[in-house]
């Protein structure tokens, strides 16, 4: 099947990009409004990416915590760490997720088409059907939680992202850079710490965390990108 024959998508633009030696398409998914960019060429390192606009209006690190959390089990992959399990068996050339001040992206690449399909399936189910609504402990594990120190009995705060950002904020260069952005872009997503300020992260509630997913992790707010030598029509039909 040709891309032009797919009824679920509207072709907004189609042209050949000589500098990239690629046939390019910009599409819109009719049912959801999701945007799709395609670069079809002879590169066997096939790439898939889904991203969402996730502006941060505070420094609680909600987008960063959500990036971690959606990869901790989903409707079709109800295990603690499907991302890690796929890493053990996949032959991918790249598999990651990143949070920026204004977006969150989930990119992957593989030279094996079956491997790419498996990873795409896992990523799409993770972002749209995560287990975060059924299991609050995912938020507590990846974000923040109270703990009692077994030795001293003191009340402490722990969490994967919290501890990661404590490491970031222990670097003077990072603190200097953060203060520059605070000064240049006050009260915007670029002036806040998208990764989360360790002193502010505990202000994030579970309900606010879920609301952030409901608001931004929707197909209408997504951008999907496919690149390389593959059956693009088959991939688009699968995504639909």
Q: Where do the model's predicted regions map?
A:
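Charge-rich, well-structured scaffold segments of protease-associated domains
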Residues: 1-7, 55, 69, 73-240
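Short pre-active-site segment immediately N-terminal to the catalytic Zn-binding motif
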Residues: 51-61
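Short, solvent-exposed loop/edge-beta patches enriched in aromatic
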Residues: 30-32, 43-44, 57-59, 74-76, ...
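Active-site recognition of the HExxH zinc-binding catalytic motif
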Residues: 60-72
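Beta-sheet entry/capping signal
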Residues: 24, 35, 47, 105, ...
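Short, hydrophobic/aliphatic alpha-helical segments
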Residues: 41-53
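N- or domain-start disorder-to-order transition segments that initiate the globular core
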Residues: 1-43
């Amino acid at each position: 099947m040709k891309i032009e024959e797919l009824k679920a998508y509207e072709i907004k633009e189609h042209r050949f990009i000589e500098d990239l030696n690629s046939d390019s398409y910009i599409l819109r998914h009719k049912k959801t409004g999701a945007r799709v960019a395609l670069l079809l060429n002879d590169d066997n390192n096939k790439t898939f990416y889904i991203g969402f606009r996730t502006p941060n209006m505070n420094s609680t690190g909600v987008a960063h915590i959500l990036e971690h959390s959606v990869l901790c089990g989903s409707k079709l992959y109800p295990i603690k760490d499907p991302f890690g399990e796929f890493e053990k068996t996949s032959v991918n050339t790249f598999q990651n997720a990143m949070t920026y001040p204004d977006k969150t992206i989930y990119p992957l690449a593989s030279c094996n088409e079956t491997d790419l399909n498996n990873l795409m399936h896992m990523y799409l189910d993770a972002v749209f059907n995560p287990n975060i609504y059924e299991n609050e402990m995912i938020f507590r594990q990846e974000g923040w939680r109270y703990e009692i120190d077994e030795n001293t009995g003191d009340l402490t705060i722990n969490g994967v992202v919290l501890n990661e950002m404590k490491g970031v904020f222990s670097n003077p260069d990072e603190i200097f850079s953060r203060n520059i952005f605070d000064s240049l872009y006050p009260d915007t997503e670029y002036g806040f710490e998208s990764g989360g300020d360790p002193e502010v992260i505990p202000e994030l509630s579970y309900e606010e965390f879920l609301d952030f997913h409901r608001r931004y992790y929707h197909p209408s707010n997504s951008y999907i990108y496919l690149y390389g030598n593959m059956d693009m029509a088959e991939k688009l039909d699968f995504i639909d």
